Swiss-Prot record:
The lineage of its organism: Eukaryota, Viridiplantae, Streptophyta, Embryophyta, Anthocerotophyta. The gene is rpoA. One of its GO terms (molecular function) is protein dimerization activity. Belongs to the RNA polymerase alpha chain family. The keyword Chloroplast applies. This is DNA-directed RNA polymerase subunit alpha. It comes from Anthoceros angustus (Hornwort). DNA-dependent RNA polymerase catalyzes the transcription of DNA into RNA using the four ribonucleoside triphosphates as substrates.
Amino acid sequence: MIQNEIPIPAEALQWKCIESKIDSERLHYGRFAISPLRPGQANTVGIAIRRALLGEIEGTCITYVKFEKVTHEYSTIMGIQESVHDILINLKEIVLKSNSYKTQEASISILGPKRVTAEDIVLPSSVEVIDATQHIATITKAVYFNIKLGIRKDRGYRIENPVKYEDGNFAVNAAFTPIRNANYSVHSFENEKEKQEILFIEVWTNGSLTPKEALREASQSLINLFIPLLHEKKERENRKLENKDEYNVLRSCFSLTNIGEVRKEISFKHIFIDQLELPARAYNGLKKVDVHTISDLLNYSQEDLMKIKNFGKKSIQQVVEALQKHFAIHLPKNKFSIND
């Protein structure tokens, strides 16, 4: 049955969308298949794609709301049927789409009596509402309903600290993910006496993007994670060339008797002071004066370190001992001493 539903290519790996439907403005569904895969590969890909779908896809949410003359979340507003708490829950569910990563402001200012929906939100040009019928509040009297909204694009979940918000400002614990659900299943089959697998992936979105777009974004996020590994060899070769050029320049400036020291200096440029395992006070003191590598540190004498603000004798002693312990380097007391 599965083989009849999806044509199995003899060699090339192929993605296919085998079902797509829109149940409502805020519920889109897509079913996809990838084949042929070797035994075990379908599970590997399925787990990775599902986690990327649920955790890596960006969405847009309302993150804070400012009410007028409201002191706490469980207040009621004259002429408004819902409590502030209920309004916040309704606003949290509003589905938005944005192409901007900046925190943006929107507002609602409307005279009742009226049923307030997402259509009544005055949005910046870069943000749009997916379902204009989503309910926000009910104005039962001839009063104004005025609120300001903060909107942001992000990924995952964000639980805001309520202490940060006061004077009518209320945080909204945003669920940025536009993915309602994601599942996968694996089916085996035999092709020319060889066992192979088909991976099925099901995706439900909130309508701010299609399941196909979500799957593409999830795949791209996984690719981006592995790209540095693919380029590691090339980067290593480039670093070798850089070090060789650096070494040749320095060699022309120093006599042959100093070549060993030059080599050491070059390598120290790529070793960070984290390797010294210094206590926090000494480590932070060095960082404040832009000492990031061992090479940077060797530009200082003990006398120079004394001039760093809040860098006392104890910190200097810790640096001296750490250099000796990890790299067998003696830090001179001053720049003019060599073997003191």
